[in-house]
């Protein structure tokens, strides 16, 4: 029975190791095919057809019914009598200005913990069990030691983090959805490949049409539920990231 359980444990470990190897191998083959050319840029596609796209649903105010007035040139809800060149419909473009300058964060934490515990009853007998145990144990039994125990633990930890970021870019985004209250759901993606390193900048969120400036631009801090991602892949990223084995070890190792 024990041998069967050991075989099952070994089989499970082998399956996990094989799965990790297959996943790493798939990415390895892809990276090997990019040697000399750098990471391949993705094609231009419809953002709403991406697997991670989710329509936005937010609380909305009560709708207002516009009453037509034939004798007026102005319609309730209109922003301007003349043609507005700013984004206003699904599929329109606008420029998002991302200017994250001198974003810094410093964090340090030191922890030292020591704990000791000791209990003893100093009993001369332990319900008569000391005689029975003396027949089994060659050195005899001290009743006081049966009711005394102690423990000691010590833990020391140090952690620190220093971060400095500067991102200054302009990114064209597309209006994907118009919410019932008139706000726009936008998304934009930009890829730049330089010397074998592919840098990606993505922006998604909800904006107000009133915040769009006359030159059809909007600042990143005016985007609600903003999701701004700046990263990449390539030779530089490979140098700064730990190897796959080290990442798996850090996740699975419990101590």
Swiss-Prot record:
Question: Which is an annotated GO molecular function term of this record?
Answer: cytoskeletal motor activity
Instruction: Please report the record's description of how this protein sits within the membrane.
Output: Lipid-anchor
Keyword set, alphabetical order: Bacterial flagellum, Cell outer membrane, Lipoprotein, Membrane, Palmitate, Signal
Listed InterPro entries: Flag_Lring
Lipid anchor positions (S-diacylglycerol cysteine): 26
Q: Where in the cell is it found?
A: Cell outer membrane; Bacterial flagellum basal body
- The signal peptide here is 1-25
Question: GO BP, one example?
Answer: bacterial-type flagellum-dependent cell motility
Give the residue numbers of the N-palmitoyl cysteine lipid attachment: 26
GO cellular component term of the entry, any = bacterial-type flagellum basal body, distal rod, L ring
One Pfam family, short name: FlgH
* Primary localisation category: membrane
Q: What assembly does the database describe for this protein?
A: The basal body constitutes a major portion of the flagellar organelle and consists of four rings (L,P,S, and M) mounted on a central rod.
What is the role of this chain?
A: Assembles around the rod to form the L-ring and probably protects the motor/basal body from shearing forces during rotation.
Family stated for the protein in its record:
Belongs to the FlgH family.
Q: What is this protein called?
A: Flagellar L-ring protein
